């Protein structure tokens, strides 16, 4: 065992003494040491319950003959960080989480890992650590929140973001009832999208992604994961032996079929890089063209994660997609994906048929995400095309330019933005932000003003997984490094053509050259601290925004 280097032989008597100080017995010292990376904290509804899940995981490890060692990682609530400077810290936390798991696993020479994340950047950070460390690893995501219910309809947090401008008694009702308890926000936003990716990659047990936070099924999956990790250690089945390029392509197809968050196009390449796999944005676009959209989940559709869980979850989606997937890839069950799917039977056949469309009769003929390129985004940009109304798939309009999210909010709320406009929010990229903030507040303000089907928004920042409408993010190169988005001026015409994957600035090249000659990079918004270090080493969003 890898951990023997810390505990075997007479020279390790001091190490054993320290282990015994924590109540570890001689018999336990001979067993596999399993790290349990628990991201529980009291800021994040999706993480408030993770101590219970960790206890179930540890019970499973003990049942199977291992010894669990729990440690913590940080976790930011993107909802609470939204709309102010705190959001700059969310994306940088991804690599800090990854680093912290590496430090604990390597310092203590753990034999295996069970990773327990739930929310937006925390799941990717854990998955990146799995690839970097290449230990036997299982991911147990914390599970979705149940949808709220008020005014005779199901609700989630995005309803509150979109309707706060109305104020009054209805806002108080939404505030009280939209988020009824523990779990990640109830639609297919970034957290749940990434949980689905963990399962689609083969790193979570079947059913894990959609098993809800308050469901006993989640506790059973956690316990079984603890038992299974000991088996993976015995078999030497590490993360890189399970996850391959084919696994990532399977995951991208699932992403397209469920209409996942645009943030998957940022996180999956970053995760792949830690597995020594180059997952280009062009792969997302190619697979999107080949993979129909099968599940119409919030924010683009009517269904919540609870509906998908009742319909059979990620396994049901992969079963539908089986003719398009590589079924030879391994999973943490120790079986191939084909063997796992051969055992799948929907518990609720009616819900399965109603929630998950067929390849022959999909919700949309193409997948959820499109990659746009052109003179405004030479390296690419990302849009959730299945959440865009048909009349806005092709649009041309004048630019209304803002150099920060705060400026854009003032402009939108004061009525500067009119139907037909293209709002441009720049200097919010990985370096420029720094931190590539999610611009949910501006998109929600546009939706709340009834303009989501007549106004487009373009940014070098990101969007929340809860964003809907013609919102194009991750524009690369970003403004802070002199990308074309830095040269846009008010009134410039911008052309959006999602079916043909184009995003163009309709300004003569000679004019752009003159603007480029006079452009100067802005002064950094931060000096010192983690954000300063981050902006100096972060790469383009088109490469996953990883650190170099």
Curated annotation (Swiss-Prot):
EC numbers listed for it are 4.2.1.9
Q: Name one GO biological process term.
A: L-valine biosynthetic process
Q: Which domain of life is it from?
A: Archaea
List the Gene Ontology MF annotations in alphabetical order: 2 iron, 2 sulfur cluster binding; dihydroxy-acid dehydratase activity; magnesium ion binding
Q: State the UniProt keywords alphabetically.
A: 2Fe-2S, Amino-acid biosynthesis, Branched-chain amino acid biosynthesis, Iron, Iron-sulfur, Lyase, Magnesium, Metal-binding
Q: Which pathway does the database say it acts in?
A: Amino-acid biosynthesis; L-isoleucine biosynthesis; L-isoleucine from 2-oxobutanoate: step 3/4; Amino-acid biosynthesis; L-valine biosynthesis; L-valine from pyruvate: step 3/4
- Which amino acid positions bind [2Fe-2S] cluster, per UniProt? 119, 185
**Cofactor binding description:** Binds 1 [2Fe-2S] cluster per subunit. This cluster acts as a Lewis acid cofactor.
Substrates-to-products reaction catalysed: (2R)-2,3-dihydroxy-3-methylbutanoate = 3-methyl-2-oxobutanoate + H2O; (2R,3R)-2,3-dihydroxy-3-methylpentanoate = (S)-3-methyl-2-oxopentanoate + H2O
Q: Which residues carry this modification: N6-carboxylysine?
A: 121
Which residues of this protein are catalytic? 464 (proton acceptor)
SUPFAM superfamilies on file: IlvD/EDD N-terminal domain-like, LeuD/IlvD-like
Q: InterPro entries of this UniProt entry?
A: Dihydro-acid_dehy_C (IPR042096), DihydroxyA_deHydtase (IPR004404), DiOHA_6PGluconate_deHydtase_CS (IPR020558), ILV_EDD_C (IPR056740), ILV_EDD_N (IPR000581), IlvD/EDD_N (IPR037237)
Swiss-Prot/TrEMBL cofactor(s): [2Fe-2S] cluster; Mg(2+)
Amino-acid positions noted as binding Mg(2+) in the UniProt annotation, renumbered to this chain: 78, 120-121, 438
Question: Does Ion transport appear among the keywords?
Answer: no
| A GO cellular component annotation in the UniProt record | cytosol
Q: How does it assemble?
A: Homodimer.
Q: Which family does it belong to?
A: Belongs to the IlvD/Edd family.
Q: What does this protein do?
A: Functions in the biosynthesis of branched-chain amino acids. Catalyzes the dehydration of (2R,3R)-2,3-dihydroxy-3-methylpentanoate (2,3-dihydroxy-3-methylvalerate) into 2-oxo-3-methylpentanoate (2-oxo-3-methylvalerate) and of (2R)-2,3-dihydroxy-3-methylbutanoate (2,3-dihydroxyisovalerate) into 2-oxo-3-methylbutanoate (2-oxoisovalerate), the penultimate precursor to L-isoleucine and L-valine, respectively.
Name of the protein this chain belongs to: Dihydroxy-acid dehydratase
**Taxonomic classification, please?**
Archaea, Methanobacteriati, Methanobacteriota, Stenosarchaea group, Methanomicrobia
